[in-house]
Amino acid sequence: MDYAKKSLELHYQLKGKIEIASRTKANDRQSLSLAYTPGVAAPCLEIQKDVNKSYELTRRWNTVAVVTDGTAVLGLGDIGPEAGMPVMEGKCLLFKEFGGVDAIPLCIRSKDVDEIVNTVYLLAGSFGGVNLEDISAPRCFEIERKLKERCDIPVFHDDQHGTAVIMLAGLMNALKVVGKRLEDVKIVTSGAGAAGIAIIKLLVSVGAGNVVMTDRTGAIFNGRPGLNPAKQEIAEATNRACEKGTLADVIKDADVFIGVSAPGVLTSDMVRTMAHDAIVFACANPTPEIFPDEAKRAGAAIVSTGRSDYPNQINNVLAFPGIFRGALDARASDINDEMKIAAAHALAGMVGEDKLSCDNILPQAFDEGVGETVAAAVKAAAIKSGVARI
């Protein structure tokens, strides 16, 4: 199928993939008076007395803002906020279909960090959470940090944390299959953008001790000149042996490769130098760092990509709907590491021990109960970690 052509036809036909639906009627004088004036003054006054009543008397409790500036849309790059709208509408659709979450696209005509932060902060009272989407690095880190500091609702950059959650879930199961432990393996990553940095932070937080990140220049190590603040933070937390050189240099004897970078970055020759039963997560889209058949011929035991036409797809839709569902159900003030780790464990646990194999380390997006399972784990973690407000 020509997906580009068919999708364009669909978008012309629909003129938008989402819409507002009424939850009550206004078809006679009485129903109109209850839904709007004069009756609506009563809930307004309740919220005036206690702003938290906005979660009980409006749809705020179930509504998320999907925010972009259009600077890093898919693999298209900086195409502008309006051009990013089809993706944001699609994201909102997935929120609803997979998590029952009402989501509103907000495409902001600014690239200024503080302007974006202030805009979202001023609108935050209308929402139960904020999902940042397709904002270029390293600005995305600063925008998320500043919003988390100012907002009392969860702020979550899915390109970072959703990807990291799925990677962790997949890696936990992959390591089970090959009989290795996270704290013992050497992990080499390619790509130091939003996803790459978030993946490493989450892996380190759960006990990964031997991690080396690479970018276009090569291995990132403490003392390498020219590192931006985000990379410097990674340099201080990883690569304790201070390995230097190219990806080809540092991948020798690695147990795990995680790529969120560019097509063809990992070669068959590099895979051959990895440890026995190597795990390769090649998640550049749409063309991975190495194709699964090449990686397996070179000796990889388990290969995962971001594509649906190969086994073990790393697909963010497994995570973000359930994560937000759980956060909203807990009325959480944050989505913290405990909640992300709980989501990863929940996803990993959906593949039973009897079903685990080299070609089956993650559930599928359409498997029954994915969103509900993740949501329950996230809500429980929110309560346990003290960020729940219900």
Which positions does each model-derived feature cover?
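General beta-strand structural signal in soluble alpha/beta enzymes
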Residues: 105, 131-134, 155-158, 189, ...
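N-terminal ligand-binding/catalytic initiation module
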Residues: 1-155, 375, 381, 385-389
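Adenosine-phosphate binding glycine-rich loop
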Residues: 158, 178, 282-390
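Solvent-exposed alpha-helices and their adjacent loops that cap or buttress functional pockets
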Residues: 12, 55-60, 96-97, 122-124, ...
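Glycine-rich phosphate/diphosphate-binding loop of Rossmann-like nucleotide-binding domains
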Residues: 74, 79-96, 157, 165-262, ...
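Short, ordered loop/turn segments at secondary-structure junctions
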Residues: 69-71, 79, 108-109, 134-137, ...
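Rossmann-like adenosine-cofactor binding region
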Residues: 232-302, 307-309
